[in-house]
Amino acid sequence: MKHRIQHIHFVGVGGSGMSGIAEVLLNLGYTISGSDLNESAVTRRLAELGMRIAIGHDRANVAGAGAIVTSTAVAGDNPEVLAARAARIPVVPRAVMLAELMRLKRGIAVAGTHGKTTTTSLVASVLAAGGLDPTFVIGGRLTSAGANARLGQGEYIVVEADESDASFLNLLPVMAIVTNIDADHMDTYGHDVARLKSAFIEFTQRLPFYGSAILCADDANVREIMPFVSRPITTYGLSPDAQVCAQDVQADGTRMRFTVQRRDRDVVLPALQVELNLPGLHNVRNALAAIAVATELGVDDAAIREALAAFKGVGRRFTQWGDLPVPAAHGGGIFTLVDDYGHHPVEMAATLAAARGAWPQRRIVLAFQPHRYTRTRDCFEDFVRVLGSADGVLLTEVYAAGEAPLVAADGRALSRALRVAGKVEPVFVEDVGELPQAILDFVRDGDVVVVMGAGSISKTPALVGELA
C-alpha cells in the first residue's frame, strides 16, 4: 500500500474500529496522527506507540496529512473534515480504509448483528495457535494481545464487518462469516428487514468464486438467505444438519464443554472434543464459526483445542471483575461482578442465560444502561421481557449517543413498564454516576451482578471496585 501518501490522520481515533486500523497502518510504516474529543486509555496507548494525538478537533490537526479517515460518528461539519475538503485532502470512510488494508492480504470478515467481536477474536486466536500469524482488527480489546489490532506476518487478515451503516459492503474478503441477522440499526435499512437481509446477501456475493461463506444454521434469518448465496457455504451451529455441529454441550462453571462433528461435503472428519473458556450457548456458536474457518484452512485439531481452552476473552464481553465484599451493613459476604457490552435484548438474554448456566444457584442482578432512545423504542417490549428475567434490576437513564430524548422510550418509561409487568421491582438510578453506590446498596451475599450496556456505564465496574 506504499504510495505518495505517507501521513494519515484519523478523526475520532479513540473509537474501537478506528484505533485498530490506525495501529496496523502505523506498524506498516505510515506516519499516523489522530484526534478525539476525549482522552482515554485508547488515546494514551496510541500516543505511547508513537502517534501524534490531539484531544479536541481543530483545523490545524490535519496539517501535513495526505489523507484523513473518519467514522460514521464524525459529522460532516467537523472542523477537521471541512479543513481537509478545503485543502483537497482525501476524506476516507473508515470502512474504505479497512478495505484497502484487506487488499494486502487474504481477508476473513465476520458479520452479524451479535457476536462479531468475540467471533473475530476467536478466529484470530485459533489461527495464531495454528501458526498462521494473522493480522487482525477487532472492535474490542483482545485480552491475550492487550490490543484490538495487530500486524501479523501471515497471509490472512481477520476483521469485523460492520452492518450498522452498511459499510461492510465495501469489504472484499475471501471468507465471510455471518453469525446472525437481527433487526438493529434499522434506520440504515429504512426499517425494512428485507433490505437488511439483502445487504447480507450482497455481502456474501462480494466473495470471489473460490471464496467461502461460513453461515450460522441456528439463525432463522441466516437460513432464509442461504438459497440466495451463490458461493460455497459451510454451515455451523447446534442444529443437527449443520456441517460443523456441537453435540453433548455442557456448562462447567464459566466454561463450556462439547463435541464437534464436522462434515466437509460428504467427508466426515474426526470428532473434536472442545473445552471453551467462555460461558453460554451463544459462545459455543461463536467458537463453532472459528472451528469452521480453522478446519477449512488446515489448522491442526490440537491447535484449535488449545486456543479455545486458553482463550482469555475480549474486553467487556462477560468480563469477570472477580469477587467483591458486600457491605457489612447488608450482612457482609461476597458478590461476583461481571461487565458486558450487551445492549440489544437478544445479546442481553444470551448473557443472562450464560450467567445462570455458570452460577445456577445464585441471584442474578442486572445493572443496565439502555443505549439510544430509538433502540429502546423499537425493542421496548423485548427489553421489558429480558429485564424481567433477572432476579434484580438497576436501571439508569438512556445513553443518548447523540439522539434527542424520547419521553415514551426513556429510562423512567422502561422502569414503569417493568414494574407493571410485575416480574421484578426495578431500582431506577437516573444518574449513571450514582450507579456504583446504588449497586453496593442493593447487593447481598452470593449475588452475581452483571453490569451491561454500550455507553458510559463502562466506567461503573472499576468504580464499584474502588468503593467496595
UniProtKB/Swiss-Prot annotation:
<dbReference type="InterPro" id="IPR004101">
    <property type="entry name" value="Mur_ligase_C"/>
</dbReference>
<dbReference type="GO" id="GO:0005524">
    <property type="term" value="F:ATP binding"/>
</dbReference>
<dbReference type="Pfam" id="PF02875">
    <property type="entry name" value="Mur_ligase_C"/>
</dbReference>
<keyword id="KW-0547">Nucleotide-binding</keyword>
<comment type="function">
    <text>Cell wall formation.</text>
</comment>
<dbReference type="InterPro" id="IPR000713">
    <property type="entry name" value="Mur_ligase_N"/>
</dbReference>
<dbReference type="GO" id="GO:0071555">
    <property type="term" value="P:cell wall organization"/>
</dbReference>
<dbReference type="InterPro" id="IPR050061">
    <property type="entry name" value="MurCDEF_pg_biosynth"/>
</dbReference>
<dbReference type="InterPro" id="IPR036615">
    <property type="entry name" value="Mur_ligase_C_dom_sf"/>
</dbReference>
<dbReference type="InterPro" id="IPR005758">
    <property type="entry name" value="UDP-N-AcMur_Ala_ligase_MurC"/>
</dbReference>
<keyword id="KW-0573">Peptidoglycan synthesis</keyword>
<dbReference type="GO" id="GO:0051301">
    <property type="term" value="P:cell division"/>
</dbReference>
<dbReference type="GO" id="GO:0008763">
    <property type="term" value="F:UDP-N-acetylmuramate-L-alanine ligase activity"/>
</dbReference>
<dbReference type="InterPro" id="IPR036565">
    <property type="entry name" value="Mur-like_cat_sf"/>
</dbReference>
<comment type="similarity">
    <text>Belongs to the MurCDEF family.</text>
</comment>
<dbReference type="InterPro" id="IPR013221">
    <property type="entry name" value="Mur_ligase_cen"/>
</dbReference>
<keyword id="KW-0436">Ligase</keyword>
<dbReference type="GO" id="GO:0008360">
    <property type="term" value="P:regulation of cell shape"/>
</dbReference>
<protein>
    <recommendedName>
        <fullName>UDP-N-acetylmuramate--L-alanine ligase</fullName>
        <ecNumber>6.3.2.8</ecNumber>
    </recommendedName>
</protein>
<keyword id="KW-0067">ATP-binding</keyword>
<dbReference type="Pfam" id="PF01225">
    <property type="entry name" value="Mur_ligase"/>
</dbReference>
<feature type="binding site">
    <location>
        <begin position="112"/>
        <end position="118"/>
    </location>
    <ligand>
        <name>ATP</name>
    </ligand>
</feature>
<dbReference type="GO" id="GO:0009252">
    <property type="term" value="P:peptidoglycan biosynthetic process"/>
</dbReference>
<dbReference type="Pfam" id="PF08245">
    <property type="entry name" value="Mur_ligase_M"/>
</dbReference>
<keyword id="KW-0132">Cell division</keyword>
<keyword id="KW-0961">Cell wall biogenesis/degradation</keyword>
<dbReference type="GO" id="GO:0005737">
    <property type="term" value="C:cytoplasm"/>
</dbReference>
<keyword id="KW-0963">Cytoplasm</keyword>
<comment type="pathway">
    <text>Cell wall biogenesis; peptidoglycan biosynthesis.</text>
</comment>
<keyword id="KW-0133">Cell shape</keyword>
<keyword id="KW-0131">Cell cycle</keyword>
